Amino acid sequence: MALMDFFKKKASGSVAKDRLKLVLVSDRAGCSPEIMEQIKNDIIAVISKYIVIDQEGLDIKITQTESEGNNGNVPALFANIPIKDLKHSK
């Protein structure tokens, strides 16, 4: 069944919600939605070499977090990537 889920299209509401999240995150981070999408795609490509991930549940954010020391807030990348299975080397 997992293979069939791969080909299933996302509902338009879900796609719109993901796009809105991307716009909000990119605005906070000071980079364009296109750059955020490229970062997300690159992370997916690299991680997918080693593990099977749930792309539907993937959540990548750039937020402001308090720096150690007195440097104020700095951008931080947070990624929540649900793992379906590990790929075994041959």
Swiss-Prot record:
One of its GO terms (biological process) is regulation of division septum assembly. Belongs to the MinE family. The keyword Glycoprotein does not apply. The lineage of its organism: Bacteria, Bacillati, Bacillota, Clostridia, Lachnospirales. InterPro entries: MinE, MinE_sf. The keyword Cell cycle applies. Prevents the cell division inhibition by proteins MinC and MinD at internal division sites while permitting inhibition at polar sites. This ensures cell division at the proper site by restricting the formation of a division septum at the midpoint of the long axis of the cell. It comes from Lachnoclostridium phytofermentans (strain ATCC 700394 / DSM 18823 / ISDg) (Clostridium phytofermentans). It comes from the Bacteria. Pfam families: MinE. Keywords: Cell cycle, Cell division. This is Cell division topological specificity factor.
